[in-house]
Amino acid sequence: MSNQMTIYDISKKAGVSIATVSRVLNGSSNVKPKTRKKVMDIIDQYGYKPNAFARGLGLNSMKTIGILCADSSDLYLAKAVYFIERNLRENEYNSVLCCTGYEVEDKKESLKLLLSQHVDSVVMVGSNFILNDAEENQYIKDAAESIPIMLLNADYDAPNVYCTLCDDFKATQDATEALIKSGIDDILYLYNSRSYSGQKKLAGYQSAYLANDKLVNKDYQQCFEGSHEDIEGVTAFVQKLWDDGLRFKAIVTSEDFLAVGATKFAKANKLSIPKDLQIIGYNDSVLTLCSEPSLTSVNNRLEDMCIQLVKTLIGTLSGTEMPQKTIFSGELIKRGSTDI
């Protein structure tokens, strides 16, 4: 039994937080005597042997954090990895990066590899790690029984899993609603992912229509299945919608590269931006400044999220009780592609 016990099991049986168990193991004075006795009794009963994480920042800590990223060629994910790695280094932690791809089995294998390296924690970058099927997420829950798992821009309710995310639903809703209130009804929503974040953004677009007593037309919700590098493919995709008779006065997108492709479509059809067509991107990446006119985009506070994630990680490892979910609000950065 003792070999199977984890700090999570101890906290559950004692009815206290993981951070409290860690403080007991570290001999912290900031624990009530009654609570300390309860935790120690359970530890003695099961012969629990704490690892480096359970003791917090102990001598056996590897001072190494694993980072999982599906695709390092993606601008958003690459920038997130940069911010996280930089903040870890500033806190005297090393990092090990695994680029997993998008297949679940590959993600599982990469996580298993990091666990075998005895990292102190694992950061999962991006919402694509959380799937709709609960069974597909079980490997994350299992890993969290031994080390804290940090999710960036994803939400998963499980013990020892900490989520730092942007309210993509509200950000997309607000962006869409700004166009509706300016008098535009025919708004194309262009997206490229059905991930957790992707679904929240789509729901935000739909909610903006419902909140203004307008019908949601599925024809105006279009998913581009191509690569995030295929901007020409985006242009051709929007062109086909136009050629098939779909008319729109604005385009809200889930990613900046989609907005760039939409801009190229407008120019090819001599549609003036923003007079004839208004365009909104998402992520406020460098791509917004590489387009003419420059693109209005939602800033999802990526750097702030990464700083908070590392702060939560360091606090958790040191035995401090940290919030399991931190949510940031997006901000619409208005530029030349809109008139709202």
Can you name each region flagged by the protein language model?
Residues 1-62, 339:
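N-terminal helix-turn-helix DNA-binding module of bacterial transcription factors
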Residues 1-2, 60-177:
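Alpha-helical recognition/docking segments in bacterial nutrient-uptake
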Residues 13, 18-23, 57-73, 123, ...:
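Short beta-strand segments enriched in small/hydrophobic residues
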Residues 70-79, 97-106, 128, 154, ...:
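Hinge/beta->alpha junction and helix N-cap segments in small-molecule ligand-binding domains
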Residues 90-91, 209-217, 243-246, 268-273:
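Short helix-capping segments at alpha-helix termini
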Residues 185-186, 216-220, 273-278:
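Short acidic capping loops at alpha-helix termini that bridge into adjacent secondary structure
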Residues 238-340:
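Flexible loop/turn connectors
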